[in-house]
């Protein structure tokens, strides 16, 4: 149950629209998109207009798009990515690509943010800095964060509660 709604019985493609933001262990970015476009992908999920209104560029569509750009810029700035807004993600270092992936998930304005190995391949200091920024923004939008991570030092530095699993059992 998420925000008072049973989501487990929804079709899988609708569950993603139910207040969950997520990243994957392996980056799932589009190399042909720039950093801003990735943030806008997340925001696009929340826009509430139909294809006809979009086709005719109705005033409320233009307002929502302008607001989406503002929110995207705010989020990119918070995650120290604003200076890279027009860079293709394939041209960025791995650590910045991880941040772009997280930005796209945060841009969905989730109730719960699921992060699968967000620190994989990053030095602990860089991962900790990124996760502190994620936690700040999650607090700003009142989102819970669930981290699946093997880096115990990172988890201890950013978590309110830690649950350890071994062979599928809580220990």
Q: Where are these predicted regions, by residue range?
A:
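Glycine-rich phosphate-binding loops of nucleotide-dependent enzymes
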Residues: 1-171
């Amino acid at each position: 149950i998420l925000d008072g709604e049973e989501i487990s019985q929804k079709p899988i493609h609708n569950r993603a629209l139910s207040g969950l933001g997520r990243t994957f262990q392996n980056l799932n970015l589009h190399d042909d998109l720039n950093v801003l476009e990735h943030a806008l992908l997340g925001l696009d999920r929340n826009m509430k207009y139909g294809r006809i209104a979009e086709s005719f560029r109705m005033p409320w569509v233009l307002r929502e798009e302008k607001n989406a750009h503002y929110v995207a810029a705010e989020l990119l700035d918070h995650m120290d990515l604003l200076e890279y807004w027009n860079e293709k993600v394939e041209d960025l270092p791995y650590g910045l690509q991880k941040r772009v992936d997280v930005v796209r998930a945060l841009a969905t304005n989730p109730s719960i943010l699921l992060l699968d190995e967000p620190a994989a391949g990053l030095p602990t200091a860089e991962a900790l800095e990124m996760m502190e920024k994620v936690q700040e923004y999650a607090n700003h939008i009142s989102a819970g964060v669930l981290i699946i991570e093997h880096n115990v030092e990172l988890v201890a530095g950013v978590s309110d509660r830690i649950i350890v699993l071994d062979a599928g059992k809580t220990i």
